[in-house]
Amino acid sequence: MKTFASFCIAIVCIAIMIPSQTKAQQTSQDYTIELARLFSQDLFESNGVLFMEPVVKMINATSNSRFFSSAYIPKKVDKPYYRIGVQSMLGFVTDDLRSFTPVMPSKEYDFNDLGEFIGFNILTGEITRLDTAKLIHYIFLNMMHDGVHGKNKGLIQTPNSASTAMGTGDTKFILPHESLDSLFKAHPLYNFPQMPQFLKDTINSAIYQFPTEFTLYGGNDLSAIFAAVPQIEIGSLYGTELLIRLIPPVDLGETVGKFAFWGLGLKHSISQYLHDNHSTLANFDEPVNPYDIAVQVVYQGTSLKNTVGITKADLEANATIYNANLHGSYNLGGGFEAYTGVGFEQITINSTYKYFLPVEIQWQLGLLEQGKSEPTPGYPGDQNPQSTDLTFTDTNIKWTIGMTAKFGNIRTILDYSLSKFNVLSFGLVYEL
């Protein structure tokens, strides 16, 4: 479904900030670049799930709509029947889904942590082991904790609100060099007797050259989400129907990429055990009893591959979606039925991203010439592609109420679902 594709494209806006470690070099500039990568990763890990959480809820609720209408399923038929149609869903974005409170990555200083980065000879006081890049990163997170939560609270300001993938407007984390300098000098290691001057100078230089702005990119300013999917229902065998949804792998262009969607479901009649005349019916045209009850389970999957953005981020994403519901319908006569149902649904999205540092960070680090998005002489750009795996999950309880009307071989369906993400659904089905 296109909603899943929109989710994956939206997350790249923030995911391209994620860095990875590179081999430590001997210049402060290289340490600054490495710190920028690590801190960008921290920002994403602290805020990425909050940024995308409303979209995951939306996909879960929308993808798990328009499975059922009439609960009537004949126990046996003279020959198989088919319902072929298009099911469309319109979801509404509420204000609480458009923003979240961003988090500044930080870590409180603990002397016991230092053994991970640095080792000393107790007798001589000499350094025997040193991971400079990781030590700088650790100290930097200590500084963020001090500036946001510690004794120097206020030197680093965290934005009060940021846009989710459904909201709008970028949010910037501002890291003034003056504040960073004060926080480094206030760090316990700054005056630690065994801290060599060369290491202190290296850390100070790396921090001084550090970018002053990191951006959490805004969303797509969505007030509603629309999706449609072809659906086939085949029945019946022992009061059971088969549901099939399918969009074969197709290239939807530069914006979406290569996308595929499929689903399989089984619906079983409970009414056949309640109505004596249910087993004798040899057609599916219209229920003969006032009410019917059925239970249904559906499993769906999606996949997406795309290359997006100036930095050519490669995206691969797959989702598995489950739904189980109990629903009933009431025969009003004349081809009209009212129905309602309650369902439990779950989604898991596994994504892999391969990308480079954002262009604006590369400008601040001197990797790219200001205003240019491609390497030029003396400005090689980010040469180290990074890869990150992310997993998103959501569960939902949904109540649906609707009406279906049959006109000859054409059936129209309209319903509304209430849950964490409300959905209005419409179906148009041809029966044969």
Model-derived segments and their meaning:
Residues V93, G239-L242, Y273-H278, G335-A338, ...:
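Repeated loop/turn-to-beta-strand initiation elements of outer-membrane beta-barrel proteins
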Residues Y72-P80, D95, E254, Q272-I293, ...:
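Short loop/turn motifs that connect adjacent beta-strands in outer-membrane beta-barrel proteins
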Residues Y339-L432:
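Outer membrane beta-barrel transmembrane domains
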Residues D78-P80, S223-A228, G257-L264, N289, ...:
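Residues that define the transmembrane beta-barrel architecture of outer-membrane proteins
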Residues T280-F284, N289-N331, E345-I349:
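Outer-membrane beta-barrel translocator/channel fold
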Residues I73, I84, P230-S236, L264-I270, ...:
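Residues on the lipid-exposed face of transmembrane beta-strands in outer-membrane beta-barrel proteins
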Residues Q25-P230, G235, L264, G301-K312, ...:
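A subset of solvent-exposed loop/turn segments in beta-rich extracellular surface proteins, enriched
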Residues S88-F92, L246-V250, I270, V297-S303, ...:
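Transmembrane beta-strands of outer-membrane beta-barrel pores
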